[in-house]
Amino acid sequence: MGLIEVKDIRVFAYHGCLEEEARIGGHYRIDITVSGDLVRAENSDDLTDTVDYGRITSIVKEQMAIRSKLIEHVARRIHTALKEQWSQPLNWRVRVVKERPPVQGDVAEVTYTVEG
């Protein structure tokens, strides 16, 4: 079993339930973890035998560009797109962090995680 982690993919996006979030936007961080049988890549040293983290980053940015009201929805879309890109049995974990959400009080971030 192997584990690949792509941490702190930083994106500016326009998610949220408030109208001002659609206009002003906000900062997000996304962490992707994928685990599974990566022994072939360990032995071959060939990019086609592994999960290309450059492609992971592209998929995250593509999905983050599609506006959603909820980070739960964004996380599920990213998760689905990743699973569709790589058909082998892998376990994916997607963590979406919304920095400085517009709520009452001083809140640094809100996080949602989906995996499977």
What are these regions (language model features)?
Residues 1-116:
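N-terminal, polar/charged subdomain of small-to-medium soluble alpha/beta proteins
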